């Protein structure tokens, strides 16, 4: 009789001797449908900052313990301490954090010229990382014919220039040399990672080329942030009669909202819709960012305390190629969602909501082009039943 995977003893820690790291091989984090948690995760009622008291899932424990060990071993470019954090006064609720080291120490972005640029094995890629940087391999346990087969390995790798605690990358089939273009398989694992976590602030995201992805090798970002974000409960309006796609309202960056109540057939529908939308944008050289978080159902009024499903927000934006050093922060997946990692103490102390909004809106598409994209994505969703 097989031992249930939640009872199996697997170590995600490295052996003491670095020479043994490569010999150990990559451990598997095996999970099944029963590990995916839908509606039970909430921010603590009295104070969201008390989130460290919430119970951890098996996934959280594996990721956090392995990540902490790599931090102690000095495998990161800097030692991440508790980040100074402030909620900017105003109606949006921006969460600003001072992260000086990331601004200084992070790897220099690659020379990107196109949203559809091919993978270049000569450039830095995730086949060139040290063995100790890989935490584990995500391994979906099939349960019957209805469960999608996981076709490729998805590695969980530390981001050596972390934004926040537990910042890792999901890297699918690294040996295949996939360019930074979203694919259904890795999006599925990203969504399932959110459902595997009991932490309401575990987020997943994707930057396209031209959307400030710094490495042209397919990867998603995952990290913990112990604060609610504006996108979790922002109101929305449906863009099509069936409610396949919504437009987020009352935020500096209106985004396309896709929603699912949790694991099950609807998750596969959402994955298909999102990837058709990102394919459309990539094919037309339109840069984009994507953010996945627990959040409220679509509708005119919502609350950040309602985390009854999964929100996937997609932003089409102006392409940004090359290194951008101006401004208090660079605008990518977390900034569009309301999390602002600020690069200098001076900018952190002087940053206002109005200045943050101006920086973000400067990266958005002109209204005419934004309207064309909106109409095209609505038409794309309408083809679902044709």
UniProtKB/Swiss-Prot annotation:
<dbReference type="GO" id="GO:0006006">
    <property type="term" value="P:glucose metabolic process"/>
</dbReference>
<keyword id="KW-0378">Hydrolase</keyword>
<keyword id="KW-0547">Nucleotide-binding</keyword>
<keyword id="KW-0344">Guanine-nucleotide releasing factor</keyword>
<keyword id="KW-0548">Nucleotidyltransferase</keyword>
<keyword id="KW-0808">Transferase</keyword>
<dbReference type="GO" id="GO:0005737">
    <property type="term" value="C:cytoplasm"/>
</dbReference>
<dbReference type="GO" id="GO:0005085">
    <property type="term" value="F:guanyl-nucleotide exchange factor activity"/>
</dbReference>
<protein>
    <recommendedName>
        <fullName>GDP-D-glucose phosphorylase 1</fullName>
        <ecNumber>2.7.7.78</ecNumber>
    </recommendedName>
</protein>
<comment type="function">
    <text>Specific and highly efficient GDP-D-glucose phosphorylase regulating the levels of GDP-D-glucose in cells.</text>
</comment>
<feature type="active site" description="Tele-GMP-histidine intermediate">
    <location>
        <position position="219"/>
    </location>
</feature>
<dbReference type="GO" id="GO:0000166">
    <property type="term" value="F:nucleotide binding"/>
</dbReference>
<dbReference type="GO" id="GO:0080048">
    <property type="term" value="F:GDP-D-glucose phosphorylase activity"/>
</dbReference>
<keyword id="KW-0963">Cytoplasm</keyword>
<comment type="similarity">
    <text>Belongs to the GDPGP1 family.</text>
</comment>
<dbReference type="GO" id="GO:0016787">
    <property type="term" value="F:hydrolase activity"/>
</dbReference>
<dbReference type="InterPro" id="IPR026506">
    <property type="entry name" value="GDPGP"/>
</dbReference>
